[in-house]
Amino acid sequence: MDPIRCFSCNKIMKSPNEKGMVFVRNMKKEDREQFFKKFNYTRLCCKRMYLSAVNFQDELFQYENARSTLNVDGTITKPF
């Protein structure tokens, strides 16, 4: 997930494009610096938010329908 606010300074973190973090992580170091300057991310805490955020939504969605409940009598019930 793209961060909404910086955890340290509480600055609003806008995703400049629809690709978000993957776009920034795949850049070369020089290009990353230009990106941060262009969108005015000068503090290290804000840069850290972009470089360390993990996108795990897609992984969670694949398990959404796999939920099940183990009943007291040992049977398994699926919610849907």
Curated annotation (Swiss-Prot):
InterPro entries: RNA_pol_su_RPB10, RPABC5/Rpb10. Gene3D superfamilies: Homeodomain-like. One of its GO terms (molecular function) is DNA-directed RNA polymerase activity. GO terms for biological process: DNA-templated transcription. This is Uncharacterized protein 107L. It comes from Invertebrate iridescent virus 6 (IIV-6).
